[in-house]
Amino acid sequence: EGEQLKFTGIPSFAPELLKSVSSTDPMKGKNLEKALIQFAEEGAAKLFKPMIGSGFIVGVVGPLQFEVLASRIKIEYGIPVRFETTQFTSARWISGPLVTLDEFSRVNKGHMAEDNDGDPVFLTRLQWDVERVERDYPDLKLNSVKQMMI
């Protein structure tokens, strides 16, 4: 009695493809952000906001999803978009002691982002990036699956 229960929800898997997204109409940037957040909440894609820069990175499982997203954003929000290749090939949710995580984020700003829930994400270019983190920061954990708590 009186204890707080947490239930595990549906796991969220790291996307296999990452691309930056932008509107071809510069006047619709704010609307694009709303559209991307909506699709991330639906689970249609993962949305990452890099620590550096003003854009977004969208992650999906298959290449056709980019075309579907572009079409839905155009039809439902009236925003023409383009997806472009990024330097990143994977995303990993990162967790660990706050002090270590803060230091890591500061040193690796160019690889850090937040997901739609505000959780820290490490964007990687190569498997070597993951191995380096595991070697240099043993207190941190990189996860390819995010457990959703409800």
Each model region followed by its residue ranges:
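Structural and coupling elements of P-loop NTPases
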Residues: 1-150
